[in-house]
């Protein structure tokens, strides 16, 4: 899992994550096995920014019904990345 693109799966675009962008906090879905150090290195490598801290949380998949059958969505990991004050913003999120 040394490739940064294997660690960062996708950005999370919600109202709460958009509000956090004002304080330079960005939310990503990351690989379930990745730790905070790997997430920090991946964000710095992919986006060319300086990361101050990383908060991670394991999200449990919801139980959903499909007709008479019951299934479960996959568990996943969420990371909230806080950038340093002197760092530039991530260009991917600009214009949203």
UniProtKB/Swiss-Prot annotation:
TM regions (residue ranges): none
GO CC, any one term: ribosome
Quaternary structure annotation from Swiss-Prot or TrEMBL: Part of the 50S ribosomal subunit. Contacts protein L29, and trigger factor when it is bound to the ribosome.
Molecular-function GO terms, alphabetical: rRNA binding; structural constituent of ribosome
Provenance organism: Alkaliphilus oremlandii (strain OhILAs) (Clostridium oremlandii (strain OhILAs))
Classification via InterPro entries: Nucleotide-bd_a/b_plait_sf, Ribosomal_uL23-like, Ribosomal_uL23/eL15/eS24_sf
Alphabetical keyword list: Ribonucleoprotein, Ribosomal protein, RNA-binding, rRNA-binding
Top-rank taxon: Bacteria
Entry function: One of the early assembly proteins it binds 23S rRNA. One of the proteins that surrounds the polypeptide exit tunnel on the outside of the ribosome. Forms the main docking site for trigger factor binding to the ribosome.
Family classification: Belongs to the universal ribosomal protein uL23 family.
HAMAP family found in the cross-reference section: Ribosomal_uL23_B
Name the record gives this protein: Large ribosomal subunit protein uL23
GO biological process, one term: translation
Coiled coil: none
PANTHER family listed in its UniProt record: 60S RIBOSOMAL PROTEIN L23A
């Amino acid at each position: 899992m040394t490739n940064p693109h294997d660690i960062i799966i996708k950005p999370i675009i919600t109202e709460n994550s958009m509000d956090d962008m004002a304080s330079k906090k960005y939310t990503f879905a990351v690989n379930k096995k990745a730790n905070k150090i790997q997430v920090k290195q991946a964000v710095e490598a992919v986006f060319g920014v300086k990361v101050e801290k990383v908060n991670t949380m394991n999200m449990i998949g919801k139980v959903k019904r499909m007709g008479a059958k019951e299934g479960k969505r996959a568990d996943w990991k969420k990371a909230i990345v806080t950038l340093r004050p002197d760092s530039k913003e991530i260009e991917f999120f600009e214009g949203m």
